[in-house]
Design a protein with these regions (language model features):
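Fungal secretory targeting signals
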Residues: 1-30
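Peptidoglycan-targeting cell-wall enzymes and recognition modules
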Residues: 28-73, 78-83, 87-179
Length: 179
């Protein structure tokens, strides 16, 4: 059963990346994320991880995201960081699903010392130093203000800047593309 789910997901990702690549080949850098792409991505995520269909019983409901909610942000990150191959898309998606406990977490609660690891989070559970680099990148792109970053004087404050949906679901693609 798991093999069939994985095969279906990879075929769906392949369809998604084919459409994405065709749009990229027309020299359009910014591809409009459309309903069909969102539906495919939602189905891919739910096939890989059925638990993403709901946030019922999530340990931290305020952090939980369903596949349907996450899909447009994830697709936009593929566009923003020029990810277009099946391997890139599968790697980034699976990493986020694994690291965030199937989108149930957006911040670290489980470090080797037993408590949270300050500043660690986003959907790929980046360490605090990478969240600082990511926040600086977002400032350079005009997506965050320098004032907000300068005011973030602790690792958890920087994490708070990069945890909104439009940034948290882009952190893994940013990491792959830049680090």
């Amino acid at each position: 059963m798991a093999f069939r789910r994985t095969l279906f997901a990879l075929l769906s990702i392949s369809s998604l990346t084919t459409a994405h690549s065709l749009l990229h080949s027309s020299n359009k850098r910014d591809i409009a994320v459309n309903d069909a792409m969102i539906t495919i991505m939602t189905n891919v995520i739910q096939t890989i991880s059925p638990a993403t269909s709901t946030c019922d019983n999530a340990p931290h409901p305020e952090e939980c995201s369903t596949a349907q909610h996450a899909a447009p942000f994830i697709l936009q990150s593929f566009n923003d960081y020029d990810l277009a191959t099946v391997g890139e898309i599968a790697a980034v998606t699976s990493l986020m699903l694994f690291e965030s406990g199937e989108f149930k977490y957006n911040k670290n609660y489980f470090s080797p010392s037993g408590g949270p690891n300050p500043g660690q989070g986003t959907r790929n559970m980046q360490q605090a130093n990478f969240n600082s680099l990511y926040a600086a990148y977002l400032v350079s792109q005009g997506k965050l203000s320098q004032e907000a970053l300068s005011a973030a004087t602790s690792p958890d404050a920087v994490l708070a800047l990069v945890r909104p949906d439009e940034f948290t679901f882009g952190s893994a693609a940013w990491f792959l593309a830049t680090q």
